């Protein structure tokens, strides 16, 4: 079946089988930041934005994106690089395999709750599994990024 959608701000068409998963489609189109970690919608590595909302692409049929907008980390490079520097500064990147999904969910958090407290941050990111870190570095990175962003906005 033929589908038409927007991928990272570009109109895209693809021929897919009815059982094709979104993760497989976006990876076949060159979006390698979308990782497959569990195939059970439990790890957060496959997070993408579907119409600006985070979804786990391993649990979404590609046919459901027809006429919609999909954004991966490749489509958010400037925003992701700005935030990613704060994660790296806290030594929270470790092996880096989980970073794309973690960054996508953190960016979704910032959009939904511009000034979250620590509990809201932990709750929002609970679906991201990282086998290398204790999550404290990620939490500090988020808090430092939010403080920097707030001071930047205040200065303007």
Locate each region found by the language model.
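Signature of N-terminal electron-transfer/Fe-S-associated modules in redox systems
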Residues: 1-156
């Amino acid at each position: 079946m033929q589908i038409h959608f927007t991928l990272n701000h570009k109109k895209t068409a693809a021929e897919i089988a009815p059982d094709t998963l979104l993760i497989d489609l976006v990876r076949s189109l060159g979006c390698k930041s979308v990782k497959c970690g569990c195939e059970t919608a439990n790890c957060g590595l496959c997070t993408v934005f579907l119409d600006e909302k985070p979804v786990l692409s391993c649990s979404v049929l590609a046919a459901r994106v027809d006429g919609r907008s999909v954004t991966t980390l490749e489509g958010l490079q400037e925003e992701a690089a700005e935030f990613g520097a704060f994660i790296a500064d806290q030594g929270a990147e470790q092996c880096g395999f989980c970073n794309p999904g973690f960054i996508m969910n953190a960016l979704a958090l910032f959009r939904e709750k511009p000034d979250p407290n620590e509990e809201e941050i932990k709750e929002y990111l609970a679906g991201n599994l990282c086998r290398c870190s204790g999550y404290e570095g990620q939490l500090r990175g988020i808090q430092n990024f939010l403080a920097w962003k707030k001071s930047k906005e205040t200065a303007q």
